[in-house]
Amino acid sequence: MKLLLDTHAFLWFIEGNQNLSLTAKNAIKSPTNQRYLSIASLWEIAIKVSIGKLEICMNLTELVNREVYGNAINLLEIQSQHLDTLAALPFHHKDPFDRLILAQGLTEKMPIITKDNLFANYPVTLIW
């Protein structure tokens, strides 16, 4: 199964953070699942690092090479179809990064691994 990780799920996974649910952790670790991280998540991480809301112990290139590719996570590029879905989404969720991740999950028919309760307002499969 193809799975799309929300930004916090990815960060908690690579940190070994106990906030990541066992169900989410097992889904990410399962060798039968294909894991994806949106480019939007990397953009969100870069912005949060630059404004001091997030600290990571490596630069973004190292993060991608070590933690994304090193954990066999695929990067999901932003496609025009994702933007069409994004434009049609109702505004239950205001966060632009989460809205794009939602649009990608919907377009690609991928369950999203997230703790964010607002995602439940959309017709997407959630894993937590």
Give the positions of each predicted feature.
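Active-site neighborhoods of divalent-metal-dependent phosphate/nucleic-acid chemistry enzymes
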Residues: 55-61, 70-115
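Short, well-structured N-terminal submotif of metal-dependent ribonuclease cores
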Residues: 1-38, 51-66, 108, 117
